[in-house]
Amino acid sequence: MPIGVPKVPYRIPGDEEATWVDLYNVMYRERTLFLGQEIRCEVTNHITGLMVYLSIEDGISDIFLFINSPGGWLISGMAIFDTMQTVTPDIYTICLGIAASMASFILLGGEPTKRIAFPHARIMLHQPASAYYRARTPEFLLEVEELHKVREMITRVYALRTGKPFWVVSEDMERDVFMSADEAKAYGLVDIVGDEMLDEHCDTDPVWFPEMFKDW
């Protein structure tokens, strides 16, 4: 079995024949991004850079962000969220597997009506945690104060984008809250459960494929 990133045939516009290129390069050309690991600085720079480039290249066509992540660094996740709100194209967020912690925050950041969870996906939200709990007391107190500010900011974003009262979101974030796709839709984290989208199109068009795959 081959090791590494799979290669697939892809015909670059203007070329007569297809060439073998990395799968991810093909997906990037189709404006499809993947967040499939813990959210760290390197991953954040990679995804935000692609979003900015794709926005410059085409400021109209949608971007698709697939998410299967356990979460990660607070500031890195906020950087992705802010970039999503800044670029001009609408961004679909699609959860497959799990979107936990900051990954659920990014899932929430997709364009309203374009946030999707696959039927067996799991979404989890909880309050931010500090990495400096072993610091000396003065440093720890400063960290707690800053963390409290960030927690309030994130809670307000959840409340605004889900339509839930601030106090409801704040209480829910006191613990790890896992949700199914249907529960996440009822909560307001996503707009569509994947099987609903498939059922809608399959009833009217048995050979339907997502728009982004039609030219393949």
Curated annotation (Swiss-Prot):
Location(s) in or outside the cell: Plastid, Chloroplast stroma
Gene: clpP
GO (cellular component) term, any one: chloroplast stroma
Assembly information from the UniProt record: Component of the chloroplastic Clp protease core complex.
Catalytic residues (positions): 101, 126
EC code: 3.4.21.92
InterPro entries membership: ClpP, ClpP/crotonase-like_dom_sf, ClpP/TepA, ClpP_His_AS, ClpP_Ser_AS
Main location: plastid
Reported function: Cleaves peptides in various proteins in a process that requires ATP hydrolysis. Has a chymotrypsin-like activity. Plays a major role in the degradation of misfolded proteins.
UniProt record, GO biological process: protein quality control for misfolded or incompletely synthesized proteins
Keywords of this entry: Chloroplast, Hydrolase, Plastid, Protease, Serine protease
Organism of origin: Oryza sativa subsp. japonica
The keyword Chloroplast is assigned to this record: yes
One GO molecular-function entry: ATPase binding
Protein name (Swiss-Prot/TrEMBL): ATP-dependent Clp protease proteolytic subunit
Catalysed conversion reaction: Hydrolysis of proteins to small peptides in the presence of ATP and magnesium. alpha-casein is the usual test substrate. In the absence of ATP, only oligopeptides shorter than five residues are hydrolyzed (such as succinyl-Leu-Tyr-|-NHMec, and Leu-Tyr-Leu-|-Tyr-Trp, in which cleavage of the -Tyr-|-Leu- and -Tyr-|-Trp bonds also occurs)
Top-level division of the source organism's lineage: Eukaryota
